A protein has these predicted regions:
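Domain-level signal for soluble alpha/beta catalytic cores
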Residues: 1-139, 143-151, 155-173
Length: 173
């Protein structure tokens, strides 16, 4: 729990512009390594998972720094993260939700304005499969705005990794 609290401090400092993306990445990577080292020793602990979620950069977009940072922050917040990587087709998001009925949130990332339609298509496909009653969709990335998130029917938009972890906790509650 101390490491999770420390990442919370890092997130707050990032929001206040006291640290920047490189420092966040260093802290998140340190947290991830620490968790990897401690995980075998925690096998019997009673830590409750915050839930399972899926994250990926939408089709046509190969950028992953922001997505990776968000994934690390979500893991540090106690989520089990299924990272689909980059350039993820709509069908892969749908298939992964089908294979993981306990998923609570699907996180979609895009850096390029040209791939924003793929984000819209993914939200529509998840709705067409009737998953929307069981999962929440969170979107983010440089060109994404709250207005766009509302327009495509996403449940949440966050502008940075620290906010993403906080919002995911709210959505999973």
């Amino acid at each position: 729990n101390t490491m999770i609290d420390a990442m919370g401090v890092v997130g707050e400092k990032f929001k206040r512009n006291e640290i920047f993306v490189p420092e966040m990445l260093v802290a998140a990577r340190a947290m991830k390594k620490g968790v990897e080292i401690l995980k075998p020793h925690l096998a019997g602990d009673n830590t409750v998972s915050a839930g399972k979620l899926i994250i990926g950069t939408v089709a046509g977009d190969i950028h992953d720094i922001g997505k990776n940072l968000v994934a690390m922050m979500l893991e540090s917040a106690g989520f089990e993260v299924i990272d689909l990587g980059v350039d993820v087709p709509v069908e892969k998001f749908v298939e992964t939700v089908k294979e993981n009925p306990d998923v609570k949130i699907v996180c979609l990332s895009a850096l390029l304005t040209t791939t924003m339609p793929a984000m819209k298509d993914t939200v529509a496909a998840l709705a067409a499969e009737d998953f929307r009653s069981n999962i929440k969709i969170m979107v983010g990335g440089a060109p994404i705005t709250q207005e766009f998130a509302d327009e495509i029917g996403a449940d949440a938009y966050t502008a940075d990794a620290a906010s993403a972890a906080e919002k995911a906790k709210e959505l999973a509650a």
